Amino acid sequence: MKKMKLLISGFFVAIVLGTSVDTFAASRFPGVLSRGINGISYWLGPTATFGNTDTEIRNWMYTPWGNPLYIYKQGNNYGTSIDFYSTKLNPGIGGVTDFFDGRDRMIATGMREAPRINYYYAKINYNTMYSRASSMKNGTIARHEIGHALGIAHSNGIMIRSVSTNTNLAVDKANNDILARIYGW
């Protein structure tokens, strides 16, 4: 009987110690895109010629895990859900996503706060200071800012708060899954 208890205890310890738990969880903003994520239009402003935006839009739509995200490019910014521009921002900031209501009033700026209410559209500004940086060329900054426009807050993976990474971080399952929790499908 004593050997049986030791054997069972040994198995229990082996299971507990041999099991890894993924503690990473993507997080969301209190407010999200009010029009949902199935049929989002975007526009590239004339200054947003770098950042690999079109490719990064596709990287969010077509993941190995599937999602109902559908984003299409539009020739102007009338009624779009996400607009892309570039401007000079402070050093260390690769891009900023600002959030607006249906009356074109800014309700939150990515520089200082997250949207606390649902927003009608988002405006992404790339920092011209980093137009030649590897994180801009490989699309990491665009991918990160698109995540914000979809309602995802800073966490790990592609949503880590950093412009200095040279790693081409992909859209991961945690960030794909949070879209399901936010918008449902």
Predicted features by range, described:
Residues 26, 111-137, 153-185:
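Metalloprotease/metallohydrolase-associated module, dominated by Zn2+-dependent proteases
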